[in-house]
Amino acid sequence: MFPVEAFQATLGKATEIFQRLGVRFHLTGGGTSVLYGEPRMTQDIDIVVDNQVLAEQLESFFRLLDTDDFLFDPPSVRRAVERREMFQLLDKVEALKLDIYPRELIAGELDRSCLIEVFAGVQLPVVSRVDAAAAKLVWISKGSHKSRRDLRQIYRTSSEADRQRIQGLAHQLVLKPLLDEVLGEPEELA
């Protein structure tokens, strides 16, 4: 497990790059499970970015990554952005990996990002609770076991209004039976 300071340093560098380029982004994945559910170990940082703006700014993105101590493979990143597939960056100083998703898994999720204090005095855009739950449901449908527990914890700590929105989104995604199945599972013993 990496110290909090490593996450903060790496995120600070990455968010500065996205902000300088005008690329909308938000945190997602295991880190948001910690924010919305309960603490669990995570080894990387997951970030969803606006594909269109990133594609337009790709050469500038590469230059900024070079100056901020990130290890990356330009042809792989270019291909991933074209295909809207995940690519990775490695912070050479902190040895922390960033998984960058140049597409929204849930349509419109970047428009619903929430500013949350992720570190003391540092607010960052984070996937909304409802979209986080819906994304976990999509990952479960693709075989992610870890997302099952995350989804239950996010749902359990949601307001009734958010639970209704999660149910509605699951219905839209044609994953309502899977949501019911996951919510009906017993909690694992720690």
Name each model-derived stretch:
Residues 1-190:
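Compositionally biased terminal segments of proteins
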